Amino acid sequence: MIYDEFFRTAMTGEVGSASFAPYPYQIELATGETWPELLQVPTGVGKTAAVVLGWLYRRKCAADETRQATPRRLVYCLPMRTLVEQTRDACLSWRTNLGLSDEQLGVHVLMGGEDAGRWDEHPERGAIAVKQSRHVAKAGGRWDEHPERDAILIGTQDMLLSRALNRGYGMSRYRWPVHFGLLNNDCQWVLDETQLMGVGVTTSAQLQGLRDKLGRCGVTHTLWMSATLGNDQLATVDHPQPDTGWKCQSLTKLDRASESVQRLLNAQKPIGKASTILTPDNVKKDAAQYAVELCDEIAAAHRPGTLTLVVVNRVDRARQLMQQLGKAKLDAARFLIHSRFRPAERAAIQAAALDESSIDANGPGRIVVATQAIEAGVDVSATTMFLELAPWSSCVQRLGRCNRRGTCGLNGNPAARVLW
């Protein structure tokens, strides 16, 4: 099977589908001789699909020489829980569409508060954790019980890097050496959203340098993905920058010539100052009045049939604002997302709030109030956005949730707008 057909099948579940053609850079990643150290492409052009499906194609469909040179485990390291859940759901969907079983491709989550077992599809609840015991090990089991199987390990940087350092968080210290060995051998490490990882980037670079220096079993390689990662962050004592520089892959001329890529690169996000201003006086004393005024401005700016996203810095302000929106009796559906929900409730609310396909273009639309839990990597595209000022890196991440598809202002769609 050629990669074009493989990619389309993974995306649609239909062999021979004519939609969802891969970008040229995605084809190069899947069919090239070796992988780069850096993947620098803008938001919205399919980095996750490029890496996961590229690795999977090399493991399952490529020539024998390429299969043997491709690590058995894909370790997908992320800085936030929300991104882990999103990536897990995408991987499960692609696995199902390709007709692969759990034995053929395990998908496992390493994240605080999650079961160590496998994940599977539930017809009504989507992705759910399947609790493991000795009696169900054959059905999937813990990922470390079957090191001979192909597997995708998705987790937060604290859980994954601590295991690679032989100090695994949230696990028995007697099993530290097992995960230490498995995560430093025969693995393709991928670190995404590196601008949010801090010293985790440097730690991962030093670990890769030690693997190269001390040797390992099988191929172990690390790929860092970010449009803003500096080369100096990857240079450590045991991982110096080569004389020729790090091998980097970015969009090609063919990619940039694509109409969909052009739409994303040229997406408009006009920014203006909101009438409602958060000041030292109304942070506490007049917090209720601030919520009332902001609610009125949101109601006036919201466009029917679209998504309005409001990102604030504190949970208490998000709650107050949500209460005011409820009192305003707007026709638009309203959702609140923050980190203090219980896991099961948060998963259900977030899935419903971020499902853009359920927004009726002829209906009243949707308003989502969120904290920084929605900042990075979350695949949602808002037409109207309100945001409170935050550190520059956070503002950049928040702006990435506005007009993410590049469709606002085109084909009769309302234009995008950002108010701060």
Residue ranges of predicted features:
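N-terminal helicase ATP-binding lobe
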Residues: 1-420
